Amino acid sequence: MSIQRKALGNKGEEEACKYIQNLGYNIMERNYRCKIGELDIIAWDPVGMLVFLEVRSRSGRAFGVPEESVNYRKQNKLRMLAQQFLLTKSEFAKISCRFDVIGVYFNKEGSVQEIKHIKNAL
């Protein structure tokens, strides 16, 4: 992954965190890593549901909309990552959870142009 893509991804995650915090979410963990991969954001929504959030960022529309890049393979990986996370947290054994996708669009100047939040994306 190029340095520019990594920086764009990090900036997108920062903007997504600000966005969900403004909606009343409480961020529990960022960039949870295990041998399978990484979950971008794990948070509690305002009604107390555990939410696994995948953040996708784009600086243009040439490669499609960010949220469409979460394909079947990525969805399966996210499910496995969430299962792994929940296995390590026995206190969450009976907690309801969902998967959301946040697409962050940046304009040419690097400012946020639009944020799309898709709840129950998987």
Curated annotation (Swiss-Prot):
- Gene3D superfamilies given for it? 3.40.1350.10
Q: Do you know which Pfam families this protein is assigned to?
A: UPF0102
MF annotations from Gene Ontology: nucleic acid binding
Q: Which residues form the signal peptide?
A: none
InterPro entries given in the database record: Restrct_endonuc-II-like, tRNA_endonuc-like_dom_sf, UPF0102_YraN-like
Q: Which SUPFAM superfamilies match?
A: Restriction endonuclease-like (SSF52980)
Note the PANTHER family from the entry. UPF0102 PROTEIN YRAN
Stored NCBIfam families: PRK12497.1-3, PRK12497.3-3, YraN family protein
Q: Which family does it belong to?
A: Belongs to the UPF0102 family.
Q: What name goes with this protein?
A: UPF0102 protein Dred_2035
Which organism does this record belong to?
Desulforamulus reducens (strain ATCC BAA-1160 / DSM 100696 / MI-1)
